[in-house]
């Protein structure tokens, strides 16, 4: 009996040591509350909004300093620009028949390029050309192009004072074409077309120049027009009409009508 009681006590001690399992608690256990998932979703949404929100501390939105450009580099100084432009060089060929007028008007030709543009100018009689080069006094990056256009206009036959407008104004251009570009003419027909453009004593040419506010050079079969884009078109249309055979009176009437429209517009 003592042995049985001792064994019973050992079994009872083992049962007390093991955790009790309640079937009722397992059946009645509630599922986890969805509030945690909602909180997690809220956390995700908040983090998404935070990620999509603009970054106010973006360095690109910071104001650009006055001493730097948008690219982050400081602008070049006038001295630095002059060092960049010092190697630019142009050589403008001069036709043989314009070499004598070039020597006569040389002072009036190179003075504005030196004083206004700061260029170095040299006449090269061997090459029959005028050479231009930028210097430390050249400030404008387009100065050498203006000088080249000025010399080219003089080489085509324009007067120095007329060509000087290319240096003072920015909206002037040169337009050149040949009579054969409009109509193929030969012999007396070509001579009559040139005569219609020039007129007696150059009256027709002067009338076109005054009406269109341009300057025209008639060099054999080549026609050169100096002026703004709109005025060049007016003068070119008048010259083309004369080449195609229109009488000068009809061209005059058309120029007057165009001039009246221009005055009303401006």
From Swiss-Prot:
Gene Ontology MF: a single term: rRNA primary transcript binding
Subcellular location, record wording: Cytoplasm; Nucleus, Nucleolus
Gene that encodes the chain: PNO1
Disulfide bonds, paired cysteine numbers: none
Stretches assigned to the KH domain: 190-239
Domain of life: Eukaryota
PANTHER family (alphabetical): RIBONUCLEASE Y, RNA-BINDING PROTEIN PNO1
Biased composition (Basic residues): 1-10
Name of the protein: Pre-rRNA-processing protein PNO1
Keyword Cytoplasm: yes
Assembly notes: Component of the small ribosomal subunit, ribosomal RNA processing complex (SSU RRP complex).
Signal peptide: none
Keyword terms of this UniProt record: Cytoplasm, Nucleus, Ribosome biogenesis, RNA-binding
Region (Disordered): 1-40, 50-69
Pfam families: KH_PNO1_2nd
One term under GO cellular component: nucleus
């Amino acid at each position: 009996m003592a042995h049985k009681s001792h064994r019973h006590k050992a079994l009872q001690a083992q049962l007390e040591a093991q955790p009790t399992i309640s079937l009722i608690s397992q059946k009645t256990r509630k599922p986890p509350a969805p509030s945690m998932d909602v909180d997690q979703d809220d956390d995700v949404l908040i983090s998404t909004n935070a990620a999509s929100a603009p970054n106010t501390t973006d360095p690109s939105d910071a104001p650009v300093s006055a001493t730097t450009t948008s690219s982050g580099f400081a602008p070049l100084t006038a001295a630095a620009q002059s060092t960049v432009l010092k190697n630019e060089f142009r050589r403008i060929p001069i036709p043989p028949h314009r070499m004598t007028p070039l020597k006569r008007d040389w002072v009036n030709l190179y003075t504005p390029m030196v004083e206004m543009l700061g260029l170095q100018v040299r006449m090269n009689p061997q090459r029959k050309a005028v050479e231009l080069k930028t210097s430390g006094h050249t400030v404008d990056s387009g100065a050498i192009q203006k000088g080249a256009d000025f010399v080219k206009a003089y080489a085509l036959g324009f007067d120095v004072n007329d060509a000087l407008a290319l240096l003072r104004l920015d909206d002037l251009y040169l337009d050149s074409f040949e009579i054969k570009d409009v109509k193929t003419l030969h012999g007396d027909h070509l001579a009559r077309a040139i005569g219609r453009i020039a007129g007696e004593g150059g009256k027709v040419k002067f009338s076109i120049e005054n009406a269109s506010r341009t300057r025209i050079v008639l060099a054999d079969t080549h026609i050169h027009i100096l002026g703004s884009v709109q005025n060049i078109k007016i003068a070119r249309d008048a010259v083309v009409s004369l080449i195609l055979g229109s009488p000068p009176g009809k061209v005059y009437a058309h120029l007057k009508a165009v001039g009246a429209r221009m005055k009303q517009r401006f």
